[in-house]
A protein has these predicted regions:
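Histidine-rich, glycine-flanked metal-binding segment
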Residues: 1-48
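Divalent metal-coordination and catalytic microenvironments
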Residues: 6, 25, 44, 55, ...
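Di-metal (Zn2+ and/or Mg2+/Mn2+) metal-binding site signature of metallo-dependent hydrolases
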Residues: 45-67
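Divalent metal-dependent hydrolysis catalytic cores, especially in the metallo-beta-lactamase
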Residues: 57, 73-102, 116-129, 156-168, ...
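Generic structural signal for well-ordered alpha-helices
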Residues: 76, 100-107, 149, 176
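Active-site gating loops and adjacent loop-to-helix segments of metal-dependent hydrolytic enzymes
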Residues: 77-88, 130-157, 200
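Histidine/acidic residue-rich metal-binding segments in metalloenzymes
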Residues: 142-200
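Single conserved hydrophobic/aromatic residue that forms the stacking wall/gate
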Residues: 197-210
Length: 210
């Protein structure tokens, strides 16, 4: 495919009117490398990479935590329409039985070219600090639990890629030590001081949630 006359995003952040050559979903250097030379006129439009949203609970009156496959598909379609091509639906602090159903929907939802692609699940809660619970329900907050997480990830088909953890909660160090090679540990919803958040081996924390 040739995307013609678009305002193509440049490395320095500017835009330049140019043609873009795409073969099998990848940008190539010239039309000589194309097997399909279908032209798409992008005059007056901006051409830039799809956006990646790794923390979103929902959109258009649907919430990932509704555990509704059709609702999740609607979210994915909306996100794609707004330029987001890769997406991590994000859960809330809820009982285990509900979380298992929620994560199952991410595994089961039908995705096609109209949808943002699910590249992982962001598990925000229940391993939070009640003092910094924010919008999360305190009664469902629990201590970090390795087997709880693994049950959720099994329901999700291994799609949980990010989990929020309050490092001042009992059991957090064991959780991080056991799972830091399986999932990105995100520090968040915590009253911990820097001595607990300090990055060290082997319990590396590589992300922070608000």
């Amino acid at each position: 495919m040739i995307i013609k006359n678009g305002n193509v995003f440049q490395e320095d952040g500017s835009y330049k009117v140019a043609d873009l050559y795409v073969e099998n979903g990848r940008i190539v250097a010239s039309a000589d490398e194309l097997t399909d030379k279908t032209e798409l006129d992008a005059s007056g439009l901006k051409v830039l990479p799809g956006l990646v949203d790794i923390h979103s609970h929902g959109a258009v009156r649907h919430d990932f935590s509704d555990a509704d496959v059709d609702g999740l598909r609607t979210i994915l379609q909306y996100e794609k329409s707004q330029g987001i091509t890769s997406y991590c639906p994000t859960s809330m602090t809820l009982p285990k039985e509900e979380l298992l159903k929620i994560f199952q929907t991410a595994k089961d939802v039908e995705q096609d070219e109209t949808c943002a692609r699910i590249v992982g699940i962001n598990m925000e809660g229940p391993f939070l600090d009640p003092v910094k619970k924010g919008a999360h329900v305190e009664g469902y907050i629990r201590k970090p639990d390795i087997e709880f997480f693994r049950a959720c990830n099994e329901a999700a088909g291994g799609m949980i890629k990010l989990v929020t953890l309050a490092p001042n909660m009992e059991g957090s160090e064991e959780f991080i030590r056991e799972l830091h090679n399986e999932v990105v540990i995100s520090i968040g919803h915590t009253a911990a001081d820097l001595s607990l958040i300090h990055i060290s081996e082997p319990t590396r924390r590589s992300y922070i949630s608000y």
